[in-house]
C-alpha cells in the first residue's frame, strides 16, 4: 500500500481549511484516511499559526515509507522534519529561440556598421 501525507480540504465555500492526513494514495482527496497529523488554515494572516503539525506522528509515518506531496513537503521543510530537494533548471535563465535570433541579428548589424565606418574613414598620409 503506497502511503501519502497530503492535504484534505474542509471548510466552507470560499473559506478553505485543510487537514494534513496520511492516506492510501489510491483513496479520494477528501475520502478515507489512516490518521490526521496536522492542519493548515490558509485564511490566517502570515504571522499567525497557520500550520499545525504532530511532528512525532509525521516522523513515524515517514519512517513507514509515506511520501509527502509537494505542498506538505514545504511545510515539513519549514518545520525541519524533512529536507526539500532543490530544483535545478539550468535552461531557465537562457533566452528563447526568437530572442537569440534577435541578439544575433543585432550583433551582426553592429559588426557591419563598424566595418563600414572603418572603410569610409579617410586615411591620412603624412609626407
Swiss-Prot record:
Locate the region Disordered. Answer: 80-127
List, in alphabetical order, the GO biological process terms annotated in this UniProt record.
translation
A family per Pfam: Ribosomal_S16
GO CC, one annotated term = small ribosomal subunit
Where does the record place Basic residues bias?
81-90
Which molecular function terms from Gene Ontology are attached? structural constituent of ribosome
Keyword Ribonucleoprotein in annotation:
yes
**What name does UniProt use for this protein?**
Small ribosomal subunit protein bS16
Q: Which organism is it from?
A: Bartonella henselae (strain ATCC 49882 / DSM 28221 / CCUG 30454 / Houston 1)
Amino acid at each position: 500500500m503506497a502511503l501519502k501525507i497530503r492535504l484534505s480540504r474542509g471548510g466552507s465555500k470560499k473559506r478553505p481549511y485543510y487537514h494534513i492526513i496520511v492516506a492510501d494514495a489510491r483513496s479520494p482527496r477528501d475520502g478515507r484516511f489512516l490518521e490526521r497529523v496536522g492542519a493548515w488554515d490558509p485564511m490566517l494572516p502570515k504571522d499567525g499559526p497557520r500550520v499545525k503539525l504532530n511532528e512525532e506522528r509525521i516522523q513515524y509515518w515517514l519512517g513507514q515509507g509515506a511520501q509527502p506531496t509537494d505542498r506538505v513537503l514545504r511545510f515539513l521543510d519549514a518545520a525541519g522534519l524533512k529536507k526539500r530537494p532543490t530544483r535545478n533548471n539550468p535552461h531557465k535563465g537562457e533566452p528563447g529561440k526568437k530572442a537569440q535570433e534577435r541578439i544575433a541579428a543585432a550583433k551582426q548589424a553592429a559588426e557591419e556598421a563598424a566595418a563600414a565606418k572603418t572603410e569610409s574613414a579617410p586615411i591620412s598620409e603624412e609626407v
